[in-house]
């Protein structure tokens, strides 16, 4: 022990999959592909949502869905969610007025959705899922997919500043939306901290595997994506 220096221990490698861009409260991750391809594919995509509606009381739009209708990546974890256009996002785009350099701007999601629907004469009080299915404009679907992408964008960073925060699009059991700028001290206070927080939580999974193993020589410390989502969503460590 005299030759070991001041510190000794073990390092474990763990996969970084969905550790920085995950809601640390609900365990929600974005598994959608929001790239525009064709109008018909866009109609099919939005047709898979259970409901698309405007919540008058809350003044936001809601996209209710079951991941099972879109992808198999959520298999074995929670699949039913409701996305809400709550809060602001930082949009990154090329500005022609600045030699097409990348710039950022903060946008209010709900206002942008209202503008898009108004442009195409869509009544937000009506059945939005049906109204979307009736659209034939490629530009409309490009705009809608872009806004959905921004809704799903949890990490928001502003070029040339220290602004770098997390904003979840789904509410927790109490109706609150995780935001790293306003959350309590027990949760990550910025986007980088969220990555470290969730890597540490994967460490808890590894420790649990070691504790439960009957043969440490044959233990498998690999964490599957399914295992990680289940752990992040169920948070079993809170009951210990």
PLM region spans:
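Positively charged, helix-rich recognition surfaces that bind polyanionic ligands
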Residues: 1-240
């Amino acid at each position: 022990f005299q030759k070991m220096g001041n510190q000794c221990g073990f390092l474990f490698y763990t996969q970084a999959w969905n550790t920085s861009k995950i809601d640390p409260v609900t365990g929600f991750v974005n598994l959608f592909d929001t790239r525009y391809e064709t109008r018909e594919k866009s109609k099919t995509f939005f047709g898979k949502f259970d409901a698309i509606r405007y919540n008058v009381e809350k003044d936001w739009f809601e996209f209710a869905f079951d991941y099972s209708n879109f992808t198999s990546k959520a298999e074995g974890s929670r699949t039913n969610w409701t996305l809400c256009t709550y809060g602001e996002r930082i949009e990154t785009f090329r500005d022609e007025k600045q030699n097409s350099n990348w710039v950022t701007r903060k946008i209010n999601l709900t206002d942008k959705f209202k503008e898009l629907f108004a442009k195409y004469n869509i009544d937000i009080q009506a059945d939005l899922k049906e109204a979307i299915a009736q659209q034939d404009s490629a530009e409309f679907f490009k705009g809608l997919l872009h806004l959905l992408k921004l809704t799903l964008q949890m990490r928001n960073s502003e070029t040339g500043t220290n602004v770098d925060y997390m904003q979840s699009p789904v509410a927790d059991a109490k109706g609150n939306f995780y935001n790293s700028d306003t959350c309590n001290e027990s949760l990550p206070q910025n986007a980088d901290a969220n990555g470290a927080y969730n890597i540490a939580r994967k460490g808890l999974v590894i420790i649990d595997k070691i504790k439960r193993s009957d043969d440490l020589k044959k233990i498998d410390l690999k964490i599957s994506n399914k295992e990680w989502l289940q752990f992040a969503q169920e948070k079993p460590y809170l009951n210990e």
